[in-house]
Swiss-Prot record:
Taxonomic classification: Eukaryota, Metazoa, Chordata, Craniata, Vertebrata
Expression across tissues: Expressed by the venom gland.
PANTHER family reported in the protein's UniProt record: PHOSPHOLIPASE A2 FAMILY MEMBER, PHOSPHOLIPASE A2, MEMBRANE ASSOCIATED
Name of the protein in its database record: Basic phospholipase A2 homolog piratoxin-1
Description of activity control: Rosmarinic acid inhibits the myotoxic activity. Bromophenacyl bromide (BPB) inhibits the myotoxic activity through a covalent binding. Caffeic acid and aristolochic acid, two plant compounds used in folk medicine used to treat envenomation, inhibit the myotoxic activity.
Species in which this protein is naturally found: Bothrops pirajai (Piraja's lancehead)
Amino acid sequence: SLFELGKMILQETGKNPAKSYGAYGCNCGVLGRGKPKDATDRCCYVHKCCYKKLTGCNPKKDRYSYSWKDKTIVCGENNPCLKELCECDKAVAICLRENLGTYNKLYRYHLKPFCKKADDC
């Protein structure tokens, strides 16, 4: 769910997920769509593609369990869809951390109508 995703992003990046990524670039946030503006935005694009591959669960609402061991996210679900959902969220959180160096505050509240059409996943 969005709750676990936000928690993972906070743990991995130390940033407030809603403030820092809720409307970042063309792909971060609920209304995200379009050609990525930078590496951080590309993380969100790949995350949306990961969600599109899921069947049998609702990425925004369904809760799953994970643990934070030695600064590492460990997904712990028996349900295959929820496990994949957790892995999608884990991947974007790690990607956002790995790209903190190129985070651009100018893209924090980027206007989505100015985004160019992106390739399909």
